[in-house]
Every structure is written in C-alpha cells, then in structure tokens.
Amino acid sequence: MKNSLTFTPLFLAIAATIIPLAHAADAPPVEGFVEGSHLTINTRNYYMNRDRRDIHTDDSKEWGQGFIGTFESGYTQGTVGFGLDVNAMLGLKLDGGGGTDGSSILPYGSGNGKAPGSFSTAGGTLKLRAFDTELKAGDLFLNNPVIAGGMTRMLPQTFRGVSLTNHSFDGWMFEGGQASFTKLYNQSGHRRIGTSYGTLPANTDSQHLDWAGVSFSGIEGLTSNLYASELKDVWHQYYYDLEYTYALNDLVSLTPGLHYYHTQDTGQSLLGDIDNNTYSLHFTVGVGNHSVTATYQRVNGNTPFDYITQGDSVYLDNSQQYSDFNGPNERSWKLKYAYDFAGLGVPGLTSAVSYISGKTDLTKVDPNSRGYSNWYSAEGKDAKHWERDIDLKYVVQGGKAKDLAIRLQWATNRGSNGYSAVDRDVDEYRVIVDYPINVF
C-alpha cells in the first residue's frame, strides 16, 4: 500500500509561519491582559426594500436594529501571551409585516411572510501570541479572498474554527486556518459551510474549509495576494491579485489591477464537475477628488463562479450590490465614477455611480448538473442583464456624533433573453446608519 502526503492549505500555512518564528527577534513589548483590553459597541440601523418588478408578489421590505458588542483583551506578559475575545450580537425587527419578509437582513419567516421579532448570538475566541505569530481558536471574524464573512447586512457573519497569522517580515502577512461552522448574518445558530450558488444533495454537508494565503504590501503603491482553499468534498479554490497605483503628480494617479480565481471540484464532488477560471481587470484614473474606473470581467466555465454562503469572498470588480455578474461563461463590463466631496469642503461625504452590463449563454449549463442545474435556461442562448448602482455615504468628522455613518444605496437590475432564471428584475433600496461606541 502506497502512502501519500497531501499538502493542505492549513499545513502550508503552519509551515510558512514556523520558519519566520525560528528567525524572529525578541518579542516587542505589549500591554497586559487588562491594560490592553477594550470594548466597543456598534449600533446598526438597517432598512432594505427589494421591489421585484417582473413577478406579482409582495416586495421584501424589512427594517431592523442591530447591536454588536466586541470585547478584546490584551495579552498576558511573557514570550507566549494568552488572551480572550468575546462578542455578542442582537438583532431586533422594527418593521416587516405579513408577506414582506425575505430581504435577508432578518431571519426568514416560517411560511407566513413574517420575520421573527429578534435573533441573537454570542461567542468567544481564545488567542495566543508568540513573537509575530497569533493563533486564534473559537468564533472568528474572517476577511480574505477565499473565506470572508458577510458584512453587508445588519449583523456580521462569523466562523467557528482556528486561524493563524504571522507578520515577521515587513510588508508580508502569512495566514491560514480551518473553519467547520458558520453563523450566517441573519441567523442565531451555527451550521456547516455551504455555497452561495450551488445546491448540495439532501443530507450532505461539507465538513470544513481549509485556507492559506500570503499578502504583500512592501512596495509603495503595490499590493498582491495569493491564496488557496479547500471546501472539503466540494472544491479547491485558488486566488491571485495584483494592483499598482502610479502617481503621475500630486493630482493625477493611474491604478491598473487584476483579480483571478480558479475553482476545481475535489473529493466526492458534492456539487458535481467544476472547472472554472474567472478573472476581472480594472483601470482607474484619479484626478483630485474624482475617479473613473473601467472594468472587464470574464467567467470561463459551464458553472458559475461560486463562493461560500452569504460570504464576501468574491473579490471581483463586477460584484455589485445586487448581482455578482458571475454566470457561467459570462462576460461583463463596468464603468464607475466616484467623487469625494472633501473637494467641495464637505469632508466625510463620498459618492459613486456604476453601470454594468453582462451577457452569457445559459444553454451551455448542464441541466443534469448535481449542484448548478438551476442555472440552465432553454431560452438563455443570448441571456443579458444590466445593473445601475448609486451609493452615497456620509461620516461625521467630529463632535459627539463623531464616526456616525449614514449610507444610502440604490440598485436597479434588469434582465432579458432568459437571464431571469437566475436574477430577477429588481429595484433595491438600502438605508444604513452605523454608530460605533468605544466604551473603553
């Protein structure tokens, strides 16, 4: 019998941090467990109205108030320091009557169209720091290109698992970990990690997601990331990005960049065959407080570009407020204009307007695909859709209301030639008010 050694993303991450540890200098002075502790409470008021224009059903209209309390301790003194983080979250329904649930900011109702009045969760994380390496175990807030918690609703998404990060070298960050469960942003309990667009067979789950990655920012204006992940028995997913900002002078800058994902089925292939290469290219011209960005995005493969359920791990330029423009073999273009009103004497006020157009052939999707058959459309030979997004945000700069943020978002999405098999014709409005409170 031949034994084989598999270099999983978690193994590679641990190996990558062992070498820096061996050469690390003396640990820098740190504050103690109590002295380095702090508590913050973020209040988030969230209203969403999703007006479905192509079907005769009630709109999804919900309004809620969220509270996120986060306590982070310092570390005990010594070469190896120990600490503890604790979080508690509460979501309250302010409005969401019969037939208007389903906006996704509140838990879904039990068939009566009414969301529950409240939902809550709490969790903790044990942490250990030695030199420039930090190990965490418990409930994690993750944010990287292959596993990122959704932050676009009233409460954040979290994961239960283990993570490891290292900052031994200037400009470099190494990380890795394993997550087995997730707390979705509109739920109280934990569940196994699924995917946003795939349908797993009944009574089956992926047991965990492993990841490893490295980030580089050691050259002024240049950033790059390389990540690998495995969603057990579903896929291997790899990611690379590169972006460089070149300042022509004090007023004008040029920023080209790219994002690339490769996704391949693995193990039991619970979602069926996957062989997907997706990339996006962008070029931004900044002139003072103005910027204009043009992007091109392409999905190569007869399955959509997919990522974890409710997550934000879709680091593609054309992922928008409503649609990700990630259909099988989809090509899309975007033009975006942004303005910072500090140029008119109103610091803290920013705006952006985007228009995106995409098209694909949904008849190429396998109607018998184990996980993605719902993407097949016999009328989708020349499927098209477009989206227009308007985003306005103001952050109070001083006084007692300092850091209070008000954000208005409006998305319009329209499809034709069979694309409604996936995305609906929708007008979506969001009003979000954040107020962070630093208790100590």
Segments and roles (model prediction):
Residues N45-Y47, L135-G149, F174-G176, A212, ...:
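Transmembrane beta-strand segments that form the barrel wall of outer-membrane beta-barrel proteins
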Residues E35, K61-F67, S118-A122, P156-R160, ...:
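Residues that define the transmembrane beta-barrel architecture of outer-membrane proteins
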Residues I41, F67-S73, G124-L128, V162-N166, ...:
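Residues on the lipid-exposed face of transmembrane beta-strands in outer-membrane beta-barrel proteins
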Residues L92, E175-T199, N203-D205, L251-S332, ...:
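Outer-membrane beta-barrel translocator/channel fold
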Residues G149-P156, T182-L184, T204-S206, A228-Y239, ...:
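Solvent-exposed loop/turn segments connecting transmembrane beta-strands
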Residues F71-S104, N112-R191, V214-G218, L222, ...:
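Outer membrane beta-barrel
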